[in-house]
């Protein structure tokens, strides 16, 4: 599809974003079909151990598809994050979350919501810093992921929606509230 649109002159680049539980399926299909220039998908410190996602990322990179990480903060309520007590001499928790995404060389760009000047400054500072995360900081992010997993939406709508007979599209409602 993407190749046809490019050949017809209707577009120079073709890509898509995906949120739901079919991210791996869509990425694998894009790698096989071709004609896709970029995919924006949920990627953050909570998903690093996901073997299927990592294989899909590898397939996309091998196919020359640019990968854009979104939902990089993988936030949960602040009080839960404070309980974990992330500590670093070099980075705030938000900066560490971004640095962890940027540490993956397969990721070409990252989207990070910034609703105030302080966040813009923090993100720019993290981007400009040549310092990498330490193993201790990665370990703290893994601990944060484990301890707050039950309070973070993983986008697996089929689980939540099946509990209410699928009559309410929970994932769509959550995205509506977010955006």
Map each language-model feature to its residues.
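Glycine/proline-rich, positively charged
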Residues: 1-81, 88-89, 103
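Structured C-terminal cap/extension of enzyme domains
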Residues: 55-179
């Amino acid at each position: 599809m993407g190749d046809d649109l490019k050949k017809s002159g209707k577009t120079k680049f073709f890509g898509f974003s995906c949120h739901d539980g079919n991210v791996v399926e869509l990425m694998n299909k894009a790698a096989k079909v071709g004609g896709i220039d970029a995919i924006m998908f949920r990627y953050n410190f909570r998903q690093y151990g996901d073997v299927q996602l990592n294989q899909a990322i590898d397939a996309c990179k091998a196919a020359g598809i640019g990968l854009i990480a979104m939902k990089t903060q993988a936030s949960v309520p602040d009080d839960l994050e404070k309980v974990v007590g992330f500590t670093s001499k070099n980075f705030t928790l938000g900066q560490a979350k971004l640095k962890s995404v940027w540490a993956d060389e397969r990721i070409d760009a990252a989207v990070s919501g910034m609703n105030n000047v302080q966040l813009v400054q923090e993100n720019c500072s993290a981007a400009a810093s040549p310092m990498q995360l330490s193993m201790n900081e990665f370990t703290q992010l893994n601990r944060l992921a484990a301890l707050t997993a039950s309070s973070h939406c993983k986008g697996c709508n089929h689980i939540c929606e099946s509990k209410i007979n699928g009559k309410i599209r929970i994932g769509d409602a959550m995205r509506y509230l977010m955006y």
